[in-house]
UniProtKB/Swiss-Prot annotation:
One of its GO terms (molecular function) is 4-hydroxybenzoate polyprenyltransferase activity. The keyword NAD does not apply. Its EC number is 2.5.1.39. Its cofactor is Mg(2+). It comes from the Bacteria. Pathway: Cofactor biosynthesis; ubiquinone biosynthesis. One of its GO terms (biological process) is ubiquinone biosynthetic process. This is 4-hydroxybenzoate octaprenyltransferase. Keywords: Cell inner membrane, Cell membrane, Magnesium, Membrane, Transferase, Transmembrane, Transmembrane helix, Ubiquinone biosynthesis. It comes from Thiobacillus denitrificans (strain ATCC 25259 / T1). GO terms for cellular component: plasma membrane. It holds the Pfam family UbiA. It is found in: Cell inner membrane. It catalyses: all-trans-octaprenyl diphosphate + 4-hydroxybenzoate = 4-hydroxy-3-(all-trans-octaprenyl)benzoate + diphosphate.
Amino acid sequence: MTLTERLSLYEKLARLDKPIGILLLLWPTLWAQWLASNGDPDWLILWIFVMGVVLMRSAGCVVNDYADRDFDPHVARTRDRPIAAGKVSPKEALLLAAGLSLLAFLLILPLNALVLKLSLIALFLAGSYPFTKRFFAIPQAYLGVAFGFGIPMSYAALWGEVPAEAWLLLAANVFWAIAYDTEYAMVDRADDLKIGIKTSAITFGRFDLTAIAFCYAATLALLAWVGALRDFSGWYYAGLAAAGAIAVYHLRLIRERDPRQCFRAFLHNTWFGAAVFGGIVLHFLLRSGSLFP
């Protein structure tokens, strides 16, 4: 196998060819970066966090495929993944995940001690999440904590502490992750039932649509709470309203539980995150007058 072919396999293993996961992890980090900096981000810290998101999401995907190597060959959507197809060995995958994690850790060395301590928790969450599908009825909640841990780390980097506001944002992200990853899990529900892994789509059963609607509502309510605590302007709530409209659109897409439409709704969640971020950015731009000098 040539070096180019090997690198192509690593790219697929790290899902760099499928950026939706990066975006779903990046949006809550960007929310926190703008909120913690009051709309004036430290561009070096922002760059460190963006690169960290890419590296840790990639490492998490590699660990996920390692953990699921005995399950993936039995699922139509995943049987061609590099480890499942026998093109990358489990040992090779672990070395790749370790290398990506090390690069992410090196990135944050210029930051404060609290960020370094929190990064160890983030590493544990990213590495352990794939195994929760064996034990937890709703592993998507664990995913929400893992995907949202850039939130407390962002506040720690900019404030030197993690305030209550950060935990509200993290809770909002947990509910959002349950919503979008349940949509994703609905795609594979039949296969997951056969192989015996646990997902929120299986746990919620016939109440899946109601649960997703509740999680979207809880996400928006918690984000509105953050806005109320900070006395944010109507622009912030306009972003939340846009996100709410997007959530309603997702519920319409998945109402028949068609796997293709469920996957479409999952992919579309990047616009939910973008709408929230847009509201945050507009609030700070218009408050400071920097949009219309």
